[in-house]
């Protein structure tokens, strides 16, 4: 993220009021934490200083580096990590975390309430009482008091349990961004300090893996290299952070993600409709997006494809009401045609999910197919609210859907 974007974020975050809640947050949640005004008196904290940021990053990265280099053997020997990222500060995560701390409630908000556009968001909380003393070094207890409960066999497939949930988020290899907030307040006559840290991408994904076992830095993601400061961690080369490796062309008849690596065939996929897409940026690349009104539509024409094992035209996207809680009134219809064949109508996706997911269907047909997908909003007679439609990857995969 460049300096200009940081300035924009800072301006928005400092001046927001509920009625001016950012459009993205209104889309992601009916009650986004960032847009929820504080109803308590903040006696201390209220922001994280530059010195505090360094303490937070050093604390996290030192602990991650300890595990990644195979030096965590206090209770049981934990294997070294091949792909553990060095954490960086994120202003947007911090702004949402500060808004959470300002609620003066020692309880997690929900995933949608702390959601941001770039990635899923995890969260760790700590509350201290007695005096208004802010010490970010204390958050190391998320690691030190729970590491003894995390056994090597819990790593893959990852098994979640509350006894080590803070620890597993701290050491989750693919998490590379952190942002925190802090607030001191009085509750029932007792002085308390609430520390909130939000993480992206979120960890604690059941069935996944906390980290890849192997020699330190032996499996660093694209656009990262072994850190000079923390030799067990993979450090981002550019502000965009770790990048996803493009899938093998052996598995895909066509794969496009709006990057410079897209093959020329991606330009043969046409996108026409009521209004053109606009292009937006994520850490991991670009995506196209648009808000459509009643009766409007967008057609993605993939063209003709053939595969002996069947094929799946797909979008990695999301759609639904532009304001969370309003009526879902849109769908993606799947259209297929081939000479002398009639395919059933009514094949469609109607789930209004705010997370990125595969939109598509596998067709068990080994002859050439003409494929198009149509996003559409219900007609004006139904009085639907505006609906958004966006996707970051598209293509055709042989034999299965991504």
UniProtKB/Swiss-Prot annotation:
Family annotation (InterPro entries): Allrgn_V5/Tpx1_CS, CAP_dom, CAP_sf, CRISP-related, V5_allergen-like
Keywords: Disulfide bond, Secreted, Signal
Start and end residues of each SCP domain: 57-199
Signal sequence extent: 1-13
Localisation: Secreted
PTM summary: Contains 7 disulfide bonds.
Short name of one Pfam family: CAP
GO cellular component: extracellular region
Family, per entry: Belongs to the CRISP family.
PANTHER family attached to this UniProt entry: CYSTEINE-RICH SECRETORY PROTEIN-RELATED
Protein name per Swiss-Prot or TrEMBL: Cysteine-rich venom protein
Species: Tityus serrulatus
């Amino acid at each position: 993220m460049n300096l200009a974007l940081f300035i924009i974020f800072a301006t928005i975050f400092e001046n927001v009021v509920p009625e001016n809640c950012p459009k993205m947050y209104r889309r992601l949640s009916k009650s986004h934490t960032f847009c929820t005004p504080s109803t308590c008196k903040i006696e201390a904290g209220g922001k994280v200083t530059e010195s505090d940021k360094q303490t937070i990053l050093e604390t996290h990265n030192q602990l991650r580096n300890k595990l990644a280099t195979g030096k965590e053997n206090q209770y049981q020997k934990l294997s070294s990590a091949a792909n553990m990222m060095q954490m960086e500060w994120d202003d947007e995560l911090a702004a949402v975390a500060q808004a959470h701390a300002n609620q003066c409630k020692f309880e997690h908000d929900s995933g949608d309430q702390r959601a941001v556009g770039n990635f899923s968001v995890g969260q760790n909380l700590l509350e201290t009482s007695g005096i208004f003393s802010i010490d970010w070094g204390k958050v190391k207890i998320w690691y030190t008091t729970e590491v003894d409960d995390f056994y090597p066999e819990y790593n893959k497939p990852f098994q979640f349990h509350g006894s080590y949930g803070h620890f597993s988020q701290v050491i989750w290899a693919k998490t590379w961004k952190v942002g925190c907030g802090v607030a001191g307040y009085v509750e029932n006559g007792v002085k308390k300090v609430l520390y909130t840290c939000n993480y992206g991408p979120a960890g604690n994904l059941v069935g996944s893996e906390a980290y890849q076992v192997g020699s330190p830095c032996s499996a660093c993601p694209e656009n990262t290299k072994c850190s000079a400061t923390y030799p067990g961690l993979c450090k981002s080369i550019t502000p965009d952070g770790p990048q996803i490796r493009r899938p093998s062309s052996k598995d895909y008849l066509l794969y496009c993600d709006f990057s410079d690596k897209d093959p020329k065939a991606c330009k043969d996929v046409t996108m026409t409709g009521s209004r053109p897409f606009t292009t937006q940026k994520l850490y991991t690349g670009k995506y196209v997006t648009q808000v459509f009104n009643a009766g409007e539509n967008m057609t993605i024409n993939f063209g003709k494809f053939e595969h002996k094992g069947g094929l799946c035209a797909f979008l990695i996207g999301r759609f639904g009401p532009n304001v969370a809680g309003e009526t879902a009134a849109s769908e993606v219809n799947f259209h297929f045609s081939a000479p002398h064949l009639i395919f059933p109508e009514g094949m469609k996706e109607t789930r209004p999910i705010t997370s990125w997911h595969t939109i598509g269907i596998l067709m068990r047909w080994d002859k050439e197919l003409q494929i198009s997908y149509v996003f559409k909003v219900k007609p004006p007679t139904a009085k639907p609210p505006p609906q958004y439609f966006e996707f970051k990857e598209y293509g055709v995969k042989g034999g299965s859907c991504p």
